[in-house]
């Protein structure tokens, strides 16, 4: 993965797209990219566009997937931890929940994950 990141960056690719469930083990792509970023690319952080997604299963339990407020906030918190960052440039909703009207999924994902504010500030949000 390190060689791929270096080659990409050397050829002008600055958008790195991840998700909470990518990797052979959920979260491992973010974890590995976070280590590479910390060790080799942190000086270039302002040149990078880092995105992550949430939506599919990541942990067991009633809030381990889909678009609940609890899931989206927890997932973004965990992605930031794995990446070693305090913000990502883009965070989006990765899955569709058939029982949830699409306008609610889109609205929640947009509000909860696309705002450029501290994740802790989102805890006051009630849909």
Task: Describe each PLM feature range.
Residues 1-49, 86, 115:
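N-terminal binding-site loop/beta-alpha segment at the start of enzyme catalytic domains
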Residues 21, 53-55, 96:
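Beta-hairpin (beta-strand-turn-beta-strand) motif
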Residues 26, 53, 104:
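Solvent-exposed, flexible loop/coil residues
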Residues 47-50, 120-122:
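Hydrophobic/aromatic residues located in beta-strands of well-ordered beta-sheets
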Residues 49-53, 92:
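Extended hydrophobic secondary-structure segments that form protein cores and membrane-embedded regions
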Residues 57-127:
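Glycine/proline-rich, positively charged
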């Amino acid at each position: 993965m390190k060689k791929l990141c270096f080659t990409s960056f050397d050829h002008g690719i600055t958008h790195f797209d991840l998700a909470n469930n990518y990797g052979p083990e959920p979260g491992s792509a973010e974890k590995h990219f976070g280590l590479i970023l910390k060790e080799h690319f942190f000086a270039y952080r302002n040149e990078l566009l880092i995105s992550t997604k949430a939506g599919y299963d990541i942990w067991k339990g009633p809030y381990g997937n889909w678009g609940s407020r609890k899931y989206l906030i927890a997932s973004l918190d965990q992605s930031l931890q794995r990446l070693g960052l305090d913000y990502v440039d883009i965070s989006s909703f990765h899955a569709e929940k058939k029982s949830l009207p699409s306008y609610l999924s889109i609205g929640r994902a947009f509000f909860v994950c696309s705002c450029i504010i501290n994740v802790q500030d989102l805890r006051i949000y009630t849909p």
